[in-house]
Amino acid sequence: MSTTVIILAAGKGTRMRSQLPKVLQPLAGRPLLGHVIKTAKQLLAENIITIYGHGGDHVKKTFAQENIQWVEQAEQLGTGHAVQMTLPVLPKDGISLILYGDVPLVRQTTLEQLIEVSNKTGIGMITLHVDNPTGYGRIVRQDGKIQAIVEHKDATEAQRQIQEINTGIYCVSNAKLHEWLPKLSNENAQGEYYLTDIVAMAVADGLEIASIQPELAFEVEGVNDRLQLAALEREFQKQQAKELMQQGVTFADPARFDLRGTVKVGHDVRIDVNVIIEGNCELGDFVEIGAGCILKNTTIAAGTKVQAYSVFDGAVVGENTQIGPFARLRPGAKLANEVHIGNFVEVKNTTIGLGSKANHFTYLGDAEIGAESNIGAGTITCNYDGANKHKTTIGDAVFIGSNSSLVAPVTIGNGATVGAGSVITKDVAEQSLSFERAQQISKANYQRPQKLKK
């Protein structure tokens, strides 16, 4: 049976007090709506229909690369009205999941369970038991079976005591949506077309409404303001840290860790406080990440230790490598095994061979460095001439003295030595010594200037 996912994303988000549409507010490094689209794709939905309204052009532009059908809701006249807008493009057969762009964290497994129970009856929903149901639609049951959903403003005092609430997430046969949606009425306290009225229609048709409860309550929590956004962020990060610990990761403090993407971890990984992981990362066995590090789209192989406040973006790091503190690896940085990158060293678009070292205050850009070479403190590859980037090639077992400038394009041959303080503008042959500096001048018995007396 084919699956369509309908995502309601037309809300204005006034309480966010933001120029950014609510569904584009970031949570764990991804727009709220992006989380929902990701889950829809995980379900292998044949169709994803997203209903847009306020800030629609911005929303559509953000997800221009996604295979989505966009439907406009020019006037926000309720959730039922929003889904009515999809009828011209909604398939006649199959089922539809109805989700929300501001309810970002409902899990694939939960929705798969909802689909399974709904297939038996033609309609199903996710409900939740809460201590304080104020403001939510109540689930009215008779003999355990759902009879209706009553919105808070329309509920009697007795109905307001019910603690089972409607999350708004449904799975309904498309045939029934085509039958029920045109019949919706706005004769209620809000003057809106309630999607919840399809429940009463199902009961009138003699259908039993299936329901499930989510394993985690935050799966169905919506976001209306920045307080709720921050609270949901922390709940989600807490859950992600828990899952990583179950995979064998040790955190110095799981409450001070943010995962804003995905990470694949090996055995016995250790992560200190205030580490942020973004994009798609991979950490091998026995990797250690120091405090305050930021990793983005980076792979770090087994046994590597990263000291505090190092930043990685698009880097590939080999085994048993030592990095930091305060190192920066930019896109294109590729480090072989047993490399040492020390404090205040920046590496960009550069490969570094087995066992080579750059321990202090160095910039290595657009370079290729062989094995067992030593790059002295203060060395700079001068890769940019003001118009174009050029490559520096350093062979195996090369020794670059401190405070050297290597003006690309230039090649330093295997086994060569560059004297400290040199500005190298020409290739250096293998096994040779090259240095370039002004002649030292020394003056005996030199007297420093004295401060004038006032």
Curated annotation (Swiss-Prot):
UniProt cofactor note:
Binds 1 Mg(2+) ion per subunit.
Q: Which residues bind acetyl-CoA?
A: A377, N383, Y384, S402, A420, R437
Q: Where is this region: N-acetyltransferase?
A: 248-454
Q: Record's CDD domains?
A: GT2_GlmU_N_bac, LbH_GlmU_C
| Pathway(s) it belongs to | Nucleotide-sugar biosynthesis; UDP-N-acetyl-alpha-D-glucosamine biosynthesis; N-acetyl-alpha-D-glucosamine 1-phosphate from alpha-D-glucosamine 6-phosphate (route II): step 2/2; Nucleotide-sugar biosynthesis; UDP-N-acetyl-alpha-D-glucosamine biosynthesis; UDP-N-acetyl-alpha-D-glucosamine from N-acetyl-alpha-D-glucosamine 1-phosphate: step 1/1; Bacterial outer membrane biogenesis; LPS lipid A biosynthesis
The broad enzyme category this protein falls into is transferase
Which Gene Ontology terms cover its molecular function?
glucosamine-1-phosphate N-acetyltransferase activity; magnesium ion binding; UDP-N-acetylglucosamine diphosphorylase activity
To which protein family does this belong?
Answer: In the N-terminal section; belongs to the N-acetylglucosamine-1-phosphate uridyltransferase family.
What name appears for this protein in its UniProt entry?
Bifunctional protein GlmU
